[in-house]
Amino acid sequence: MRTRPAPGTLTVGPVALPDSPVLPAAIAGVAGILFVVLRLLVVARGDPSRFVVAGTTFTDPATAPHGLHIFPNNGYDGQFFYRLGLAPVRMAHTAFGIRLDTTYRLQRIGYPALAWLFTGGQHRMLPDVLIILNVVGLAVLAWLGAVLAQDCGRHALWGLVFAGYFGAVLSLSRDLAEIVAALMTAGAWMVVAIYHVAVL
């Protein structure tokens, strides 16, 4: 691990902000929670399955899991991550009443596989876990970004740049995989940059 400059503080007016990865992680985590709670109460009407944004074009209301809200339209990509989260090893084009729009979806298995792991295969928990994974992922992404920023001699708050990209709002609101994908990329980058792991 490289030697970096001694930690310091960033002063904003009369407030001194510590140079710690915990600060951007906490800011990103709280922002993610507030956004999800507001969306859940205002837009989703208290129903976390609305974050999936399943639509009748690809999701059959007659055979889809009980309790999944299905919109009368195409839906959005979250319905495919939800479907893969129900059974990641089930590679059929149609399962649980949800038809994949393309087999390309099967390659994006990380986020739904993690969700399946944390639900223990309990389908009713999946909408909640998909949301929780993205909120936690946002906080961890900010933490990893802060560690990388510190390694480059910057204040830890620069970690918010990693968590603050515009797509995070869409990922949080529609159960998309970008936050988890960015988290895995930043984690790999940290291992390579800080610990000098050789890359082929």
Spans of model-derived segments:
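Short acidic/glycine- and proline-prone juxtamembrane loop motifs at membrane-interface regions
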Residues: S173-V180
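Transmembrane-helix motifs of polytopic, lipid-linked glycan transferases
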Residues: A113-G120, V129-C152
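Short hydrophobic/aromatic helix or loop-helix immediately within or flanking a transmembrane segment
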Residues: G75-H123
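Start-transfer (signal-anchor) and selected internal transmembrane alpha helices
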Residues: M1-T63
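Transmembrane-helix signature of polytopic, membrane-embedded enzymes
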Residues: M125-V129, G145-Y165, A182, Y195-A198
